[in-house]
Amino acid sequence: SFMFCQLNKIFTFTFVILMVNISCGQTSLNNNIDFKIDSLINSSISQKAFPGAQVYIKIGEEILTNKSFGYHTYDSIVKVENNHFYDLASLTKVLASTIALMKLYEDFDLDLNDPISKYFPELKKSNKKNTTFNEVLSHTSGWTPYINHHYLLKRKNGKLKRSIIRNKKSKRFNLKVSKNLFLRESYHKKIFKRIKKSEVNNPGEYLYSGLFFFYIPRLVEKITSQKYEDYLNATFYKNIKNNSLGFNPSDYSNVVPTEQDNFFRNTLVHGSVHDEAASLFGGRSGNAGLFGSAQSIGELIKILETWDFNNSNTLLKKSTITKFTEYAIPDSNIRRGLGFDKPTKEIEERYPNKNLSDQSFGHTGFTGTFFWTDPKVKLSMVFLTNRVYPSRENQKLYKKNIRSKLLDIVFENLKN
C-alpha cells in the first residue's frame, strides 16, 4: 500500500502539472505580450534608464496595452498612474504645431510652397526670406538647429541679468518661466531678432532645426485670430476622450518631474516645461510645452489613423494626413515627412525599428517621449518616460535601444 500511495502521489502531481500547463498555455497567448512588455520596462527601470513610464498600444480598434510603470522619481514615492502627465517635449512639434498647420492648410488654403516671410515680413530682409513651409517642416531649410537663449540671460559672473529676468513677479516681469523666474515679455522681440539673424547653411540638406516652430503660435493667431492654445483646444483637444493634453498643467501632483536644472532655473523642473527656450515663452510654444498622458495621445492620434476612416467623425482629411505623413522628399535619403518623423530609408538597420513600413510616422521628444503610427499594420504606439530625471546625461533609453525593443515585441505579437 506504501507503493500504491507513492504512485498515487506521482500520478496526482503529474496530473496537476499537466493541468497547470494546459491552463497556462491559454493565458500565455493573451498575456505573452503583457509579460514581455512588463519585463522590458521593469528591467529598464531597475537599470535606471528612467524612473517610470506609460505605454499605450493599439492595433486596429483594439487597445492591447494601456499601462503605467514605476514611479515619478527613483525614490519610489509617487507611483505613475494612467492619468498622470509627462512633459512631451518635441512631440509638441507634431501634436500641437503640425496638426494646427494641417488644419490651416485645409481651412485657410495655406500654401506649403509659399515662403514663410509672406506671413512674417520681418524675415523679408533676412537670409530666410525664401525659406518655404515645405523646407522648414521637412528640416531641409538649412536653419540653425537650436539657440541657447538662456545662456544669454546670465552675466559673466553667473548672475542673471536683472534688466531682463527676475526672481519675483511684477508688472514688468510678468511672464512665468519657472517657479522662481519671471521674464519681461518684451524680450520676445530679442529672441525673434536672434532667430532672424542666425545662420542658414546648405538649404536642401537634412538638418533638424526647431527654430521655425517658435513662429507657429504667431502664425495661428495671424490666420485664425485665436490664441494658439485656444485654437488647439477648440479644434482638437476638447474633442478627445480622457483628455489631459495642454500647456502649463495646474495640478503638479499628477505631473511627472523632469530634470534637476542647476544651470538656469536652479530647481527641479516640475510642472513647467523642461525645454529652456520654450520656458521663455511661458511654456506656450510650438517647439515644446505640451503635457499629457499616453492614453490621451492615443486618443488624439486617432485623427491621424487613416484606416477604418469615417469622414463624418474626423477632424482632418485623409489626403491631408497622407500629404504630411509621407516622405517629403521621396527621391533622396532624407527621412522626414512634413513635421512628422519617419523611418530611415535603408531597410537593414532601419530606425526606429526594422519592422516599420514606409507609410509609418511619429516623433520623439528629448525628455524621453515617443509615439509612432503604422497604417500598414494599423498600429499606434505611445511610450512616455522622464529619462532626463535627474539629469539629461542619462542616455540609457537610447543605448539600450528600449523603444525599438518595445516595437519588436509588438511586431512579434502581430506575426503570431
PLM feature spans:
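Residue-level preference for non-acidic, small/hydrophobic
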Residues: 41, 55, 61, 93, ...
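Structural recognition of the beta-strand scaffold that forms the well-ordered cores
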Residues: 54-56, 135-137, 246, 371-372, ...
